[in-house]
Structure formats: C-alpha cells, structure tokens
C-alpha cells in the first residue's frame, strides 16, 4: 500500500534531476524573460529612446508597424499579399467607373401594340376615308383637293337591260311605286288600245275584262289585262 509518509523529506533537486534540467538554467531563463518583458512595457509606455546593442533585436521585433500588422491580419484571413493588392486596385477601378460614367442599360422591346392614329376634320372626313380605302390620286386644285369628287352612283335600272328603245318605256317594270300604276291602269290600257286600233291585224286591248279578238282566219287569242308596266319616266309623259 502506497502512503504519503516521508515525502516531505525528499529534496526538490531529485525532481529536477529526474527531468534532466539544471537548477541554474531555470533561474537564468526566467530572469531573462522578466527583463525582456519589463523593457517591452517600458518602451510602449514611455517615448522611444536610443536602443542599446543588447536590446536592439527585441525592441525591433516587439514594436509592430502598421504595414506589418495589416499584412499579418490579411494573411490570417486566408489571402496572400499579391491577391490583396490586386483586389484593392480592382475595387478602386470599379469605384472610378461608377462615379465617372453610369453603365448603360439595354433597351427592351416594347410589348405594346403599335396604334395608328388618323386625324380628320368633319369637313374632309369622307375624303380621308377614300384615301385610306384606296381612292385614286388626281393632280387637281379643285375644291375636293387631291381626291376624286364624291359622286352618288347611278342606280342600275331594269329598263336599261331590256332590248327596247329609249322611247318605248311601256315594257319595263316600275322600280319604286307599283300602286300608282295599278290605280291608273285603266287610262294606260286606253292609251295602248288607241295606239294599236288603226292596224286591222293587230289585237286591241279592252279597258276592262280580258277578252279575245278573232282575226279573219278564225283563230282567237286571249290576252291579259296588264300586258305591260311603265317606268317612272313614262309616268311623266302621261
């Protein structure tokens, strides 16, 4: 059983010999370190003074310069000296570019549909419509300007398509009002019957009911009560 009796009588030099350390080295080492620390504190508190040859190395290493401090801090952060210098130069260039000239943005294509506006007064609105729809251009300084005069189209009549002449308008159908002709059909039949009454071979048209007339050969032909229809122009003549 291990006891602690008799440990007080053991000399301390036995432990020092067990670690292979001399007693005179320990005292000198600590005294030298204490001296260096005292001088370093004295140089940081007081003004700089003339360095002695014995403490020149310690003072030069103890006093830190701003450039070396920056270098050490940057090295600890993980970047080398050339990279730090290059990065600072790039930042300065970027600052100068942004301050001197603003970066241009590319123009985006507008998504709005292009709308064409046409200005026209109420006075020349019809001429504007003809121009937009493709009216013919004429070089004339008339009241209509550069456009053809606005003309109402001629109505297409059925009488113009019939093979009859312009004087005989009784074979055409009336265009607008048929009731006027139906009310005066008796006078029309009388006029047509008088025109053909001189010819014996022609057939006379009665004024009332339909009838048949016999020719010398004995043949009979029955005619309708309304054989022809006049046009509007024939009413003026009547």
Curated annotation (Swiss-Prot):
Gene Ontology annotations for the cellular component aspect, listed alphabetically: nucleus
Main location: nucleus
Triggers of expression: By cold, salt stress and dehydration.
Comp. bias intervals (Polar residues): 68-78
GO MF annotations, alphabetized: calmodulin binding
Subunit structure: Interacts with calmodulin (CaM). Interacts with WRKY25 and WRKY51.
The name this protein goes by in its record: Calmodulin-binding protein 25
Gene name of this polypeptide: CAMBP25
């Amino acid at each position: 059983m291990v006891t602690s009796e008799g440990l007080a009588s053991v000399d301390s030099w036995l432990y020092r010999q067990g670690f292979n350390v001399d007693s005179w080295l320990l005292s000198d080492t600590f005294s030298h370190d204490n001296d260096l620390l005292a001088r370093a504190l004295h140089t940081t508190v007081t003004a700089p003074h003339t360095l002695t040859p014995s403490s020149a190395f310690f003072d030069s290493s103890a006093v830190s310069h701003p450039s070396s401090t920056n270098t050490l801090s940057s090295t600890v952060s993980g970047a080398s000296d050339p990279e730090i210098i290059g990065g600072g130069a790039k930042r300065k260039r970027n600052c100068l570019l942004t301050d001197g000239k603003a970066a241009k943005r590319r123009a985006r294509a507008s998504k709005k549909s292009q709308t064409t506006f046409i200005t026209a007064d109420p006075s020349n609105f019809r001429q504007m419509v003809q121009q937009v729809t493709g009216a013919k251009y004429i070089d004339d300084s008339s009241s209509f300007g550069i456009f053809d005069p606005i003309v109402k189209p001629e109505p297409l009549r059925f009488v113009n398509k019939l093979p009859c002449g312009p004087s005989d308008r009784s074979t055409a159908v009336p265009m607008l009002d048929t009731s006027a002709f139906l009310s005066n059909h008796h006078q029309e039949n009388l006029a047509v019957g008088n025109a053909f009454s001189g010819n014996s071979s022609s057939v006379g048209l009665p004024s009332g009911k339909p009838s048949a007339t016999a020719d010398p050969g004995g043949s009979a032909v029955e005619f309708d009560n309304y054989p022809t229809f006049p046009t509007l122009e024939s009413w003026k003549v009547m």
